[in-house]
């Protein structure tokens, strides 16, 4: 069953989403050469405390940290550690969430540590982020879940990969419903699987975390011995972007974007829903 939210509940999720946005801003500034991924976790904990918010990652299924810090070939669920020191040229994806009065926010971004990154890495992150926005733009009343998957996949497949070949759209992980829990039905693939059908129709009150994960090579992954860290099987580097989005009668509201998604959705000719906290 898909949890449909009231306008008041979406407003609470917007509060949680803005805390996530604040964590993103603080960790992005702190992700510099010489910092450890545990340093970034400490930054996130400080932001949560300042906003009287709870972490939704810490303790989830036994996860031992507040945020996920996934460096280079790590796709998702990297565990912050004092032993992982960021270096010039690294790429890091930071995934984090927050809870306000029982309502969840969840989002991720990819950042470049230092300078001197290969153009293929810059393009990988751009393609992944833009495919997320294509998916968000497809979150409109009357569409079905598969329309979001199709929008994400179509955008990625239309982008030429530097050096040839195709980007790997990660198969084993995807987006999800969000609300009173961080992960809820429905599961959202980042590609079209016709065996799954079209999925539910999108109606006001529908809330999703849309999160493409893309690699420079394989779509296949494996989990390391810590039972959390997910890496590409061929060692190619990856990118991960995510926003939590609510569908309202006035259109989509990107709960974890500071401006509610207004600027990016305008590029698609879409007006973002009014911010309930404005």
Q: What name fits each language-model region?
A:
Residues 1-278:
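Active-site neighborhoods and metal-handling regions in enzymes and metal-associated proteins
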